[in-house]
Regions:
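Kelch-like beta-propeller repeat domains
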Residues: 1-104
Length: 104
């Protein structure tokens, strides 16, 4: 028995191609949140229909950070990363939180 999957493009507009970004699911608001990567330190949300850029201000640009959802506080937590992907000595140790409206 084999399965056949059919993919459908849901949105024509969204984040530019990138790598080194972080992405996590925000359960309280049922959104996928994408931050940063190689291109820009911007924040995007996917609501199962469309991508929306939601924040221009926030953590400085970085690659390879980690982001998880804290269910008890209903916030996304972003940690670390590097300023230059080819220079791990430029590692960051800061922590940021996304509450669905702004980074702090």
């Amino acid at each position: 028995m084999s399965e056949r999957w059919i993919w459908t493009q849901k949105a024509d507009i969204g984040p530019s191609p990138r790598y080194g970004h972080a992405m996590a699911y925000e359960a309280a608001r049922q959104r996928v949140v994408l931050f940063g990567g190689e291109v820009d330190p911007n924040t995007w949300e996917w609501d199962r229909v469309a991508w929306t850029q939601v924040a221009d201000m926030g953590p400085p640009g970085r690659w390879y950070c980690a982001m998880v959802y804290d269910d008890s506080r209903q916030r996304l937590v972003l940690f670390g990363g590097v300023l230059q992907p080819d220079n791990p000595s430029r590692a960051l140790g800061d922590t940021w939180e996304w509450d669905g409206t702004e980074w702090t």
